[in-house]
Curated annotation (Swiss-Prot):
GO terms for biological process: adaptive immune response. Glycans are attached at residue 43. PROSITE patterns: IG_LIKE. Gene3D superfamilies: Immunoglobulins. SMART domains: IG. Disulfide bonds join 44-111. InterPro entries: Ig-like_dom, Ig-like_dom_sf, Ig-like_fold, Ig_sub, Ig_V-set, TCR_variable_region. CDD domains: IgV_TCR_alpha (cd04983). Residues 115-132 are annotated as: J segment. This is T-cell receptor alpha chain V region CTL-F3. Residues 1-22 form the signal peptide. The keyword Glycoprotein applies. GO terms for cellular component: T cell receptor complex.
Length: 132
């Protein structure tokens, strides 16, 4: 196959942009184990070229992942099932917190970001195990 040099350059550029769009999500803890009643904090930091939308998903054993939170503006603090998450654009963080862990909170938690409807970029996930 014989391509013109400008066509090759465009293809290489497109492949580079597709491979590295500048978005990443980091969940520093892969496994968190704590006693029922203690506070929970699951860390999520991100890097993004644009101003992203952030999400937390929860996946209980033998169930599909479910959306737990979405955040579109700075310093909003929605609450769901006792959990809350605050988006801090200044520190590029969207940590998930709960004042008192329950046994039913044991699950896999994923932080994710999206830029204006583009694909979701997920963190590695954090498995929370709550013991009596």
């Amino acid at each position: 196959m014989n391509m013109r040099p400008d066509t090759c350059s465009v293809l290489v550029l497109l492949l580079m942009l597709r491979r590295n769009n500048g978005d990443s999500v980091t969940q520093t803890e892969g496994l968190v184990t704590l006693t029922e009643g203690l506070p929970v904090m699951l860390n999520c930091t991100y890097q993004s070229t644009y101003s992203p939308f952030l999400f937390w998903y929860v996946q209980h054993l033998n169930e599909a992942p479910k959306l737990l939170f979405k955040s579109f503006t700075d310093n909003k603090r929605p609450e769901h099932q006792g959990f809350h998450a605050t988006l801090h654009k200044s520190s590029s963080s969207f940590h998930l917190q709960k004042s008192s862990a329950q046994l039913s909170d044991s699950a896999l938690y994923y932080c994710a970001l999206s830029n204006a409807g583009a694909k979701l970029t997920f963190g590695g996930g954090t498995r929370l195990t709550v013991r009596p």
